[in-house]
């Protein structure tokens, strides 16, 4: 009985030592990957043993007075979302009218485009129409 207890204790200590040894070996590798920017969020969270934090995506909708439009969603930064929306719009007079993380929409009243945002498509559409004080929805996007 004492022999089994000693054997289990020895195995537990060996397992703990091996885990610590692997941790010491992995830390320089993780630091090197982080310095190069090549470590993915998934790999980092697996190593840390923590849940993966939600990734925030950004979106934007751009319009020109001519009616030309462009939209972007699932972008990693607000600046990239605006850039993609403006590129897709393709008109020099395009302006971003809605910037969002969840949903965005654009309302038009015949003379002006107005953006809105919300947690859902419906909320974003309502926000755009309310900000314009009327009009109709002409575009929307959600991440």
From Swiss-Prot:
Induction of expression: A member of the dormancy regulon. Induced in response to reduced oxygen tension (hypoxia), low levels of nitric oxide (NO) and carbon monoxide (CO). It is hoped that this regulon will give insight into the latent, or dormant phase of infection.
Family statement: To M.tuberculosis Rv1269c.
Pfam families assigned: DUF4189 (PF13827)
Residues annotated as signal peptide: 1-32
Protein name (record): Uncharacterized protein Rv1813c
InterPro entries named in the record: DUF4189
UniProtKB keywords: Signal
Gene source species: Mycobacterium tuberculosis (strain ATCC 25618 / H37Rv)
């Amino acid at each position: 009985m004492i022999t089994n207890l000693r054997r289990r204790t020895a195995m537990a200590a060996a397992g703990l030592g091996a885990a610590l040894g692997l941790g010491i070996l992995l830390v320089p590798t993780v630091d090197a990957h982080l310095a190069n920017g090549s470590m993915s969020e998934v790999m980092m969270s697996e190593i840390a043993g923590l849940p993966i934090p939600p990734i925030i995506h950004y979106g934007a909708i751009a319009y020109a007075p001519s009616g030309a439009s462009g939209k972007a969603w699932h972008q990693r930064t607000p600046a990239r979302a605006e850039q993609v929306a403006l590129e897709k719009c393709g008109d020099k007079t395009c302006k971003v009218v809605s910037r969002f993380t969840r949903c965005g929409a654009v309302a038009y009243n015949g003379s002006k485009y107005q953006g809105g945002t919300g947690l859902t498509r419906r909320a974003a559409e309502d926000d755009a129409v309310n900000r314009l004080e009327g009009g109709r929805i002409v575009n929307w996007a959600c991440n």
